[in-house]
Amino acid sequence: QHICRHPHELTEAIRAGTYRPSPVLRTEIPKEEPGKFRELGIPTVQDRLVQQAIAQVLSFYYDPTFSTRSHGFRPNEKAHNAIYDVLDAADKGYRWVVDMDLEKFFDTINHAKMVQILSERIKDGRVISLIHKFLRADVQLKNGHVEKRDKGAPQGGPLSPILANILLDKLDKEIEARGLRHSRYADDMVIFCKTKRAAERVCASITEFIEKKLLLKVNRDKTK
């Protein structure tokens, strides 16, 4: 109600660079695997509104430049398109697949790397600063305690999905620059190869790129 009555206050705070996001509320939802849970960070109504506005603008500018092999968190894209990539690769003789697993992807996004990538195209420092504030927003636990955060982009808000695609588009472009075929849905990705030896080389080199260039962590136990 306050937002509706005083929209100018919110606008002026954003323009002046004085807007401060509230802590996100941590909650858990069960995963398909029994006993496993996914942590979400739920923003306030006002923060969700601001995040959604930022996400819409980012999507407008970035989405047209994304790889055609990226299918998650995008308008007019769906999981079935990733399946079509797999079928098409199989038809063309690709019999080996590197299944890359990024360990706790959303929870481990490096803030400095994210800001660096955004700054390549966004020249308004106020926008970069506001996004950085959302990335660093405190986390309120169920017991009322508040935790500081120096990495990660909490799932549960409208901004994290587009930021994830902006970051991982660097990976898409690297794979394509090497002449490789792949398909990605959010942080789930497969790379297609024609021989076992090629798959092993690709797995090693792409793992190195992910960890050294994007500062993410590959789960070696699940990557195969």
Can you say where each PLM-predicted feature lies in the sequence?
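Short small-residue beta-strand/loop micro-motif enriched in glycine and branched aliphatics
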Residues: 35-40, 63-66, 97
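Short connector loops/turns at beta-strand edges and beta->alpha or beta->beta junctions
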Residues: 34, 59-63, 140
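Hydrophobic alpha-helical hairpins/lids featuring a short glycine-rich hinge
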Residues: 40-57, 64
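Conserved polymerase palm-domain catalytic core
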Residues: 6-9, 13-28, 65-69, 73-77, ...
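Non-catalytic, polymerase-adjacent accessory regions of viral genome-replication enzymes
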Residues: 1-4
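Conserved beta-strand/loop block within the catalytic cores
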Residues: 21-37, 42-43, 47
